[in-house]
A protein has these predicted regions:
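Glycine-/acidic-rich phosphate or pyrophosphate-binding loops and their flanking alpha/beta elements
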Residues: 29-32
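Short beta->alpha transition motifs characteristic of CBS
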Residues: 1-10, 69
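Immediate flanking context of iron-sulfur cluster ligation sites
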Residues: 34-46
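Short connector loops at helix/strand junctions that flank enzyme active sites
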Residues: 19, 37-38, 59
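Zinc-dependent deaminase
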Residues: 48, 55-124
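A short, polar/charged loop-to-alpha-helix boundary motif
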Residues: 9-27
């Protein structure tokens, strides 16, 4: 059962903290019990950044499944020459070592890559 869905609101708001992964953590804290949060599985197209990984851990959300890693995204951004990430890239478990994490999912990498190219204003 899907309980919450969101997307990045950074481009439309100019607010670099408007990540969907952080919104998931905020929604879960307000709407789920601690037990429900612990049992929840969060699916994302990209690995959580440090801010989102911390939020996920602080509210006690369960397993994370991500399609592409932060390292993959950093490599693509470097290839496209669209600028560095505003924070250092770290795997989720470097920020929140007790979270259960699965990813990346290689068969989804090219779809996510195309999505990120478009969001960077580049042709697919």
């Amino acid at each position: 059962e899907v309980r919450f869905e969101d997307y990045s609101h950074e481009a439309e708001t100019g607010d670099g903290t408007r990540h969907p992964e952080f919104a998931i953590a905020q929604w879960a804290a307000a709407n789920l019990t601690a037990e429900e949060r612990d049992r929840a599985v969060v699916y994302t197209s990209a690995e959580h950044c440090p801010m989102c990984a911390a939020g996920h851990a602080w509210v006690g959300l369960g397993r994370i499944v991500f399609a592409t890693s932060s390292a993959q995204i950093l490599a693509w951004r470097t290839e496209w020459e669209v600028g560095a990430m505003p924070v250092a890239v770290h795997p989720i478990n470097h920020i929140a070592p007790h979270l259960t994490v699965a990813g990346p999912v290689p068969e989804l990498a090219q779809r996510v890559r195309a999505l990120l190219r478009r969001s960077a204003g580049l042709a697919s």
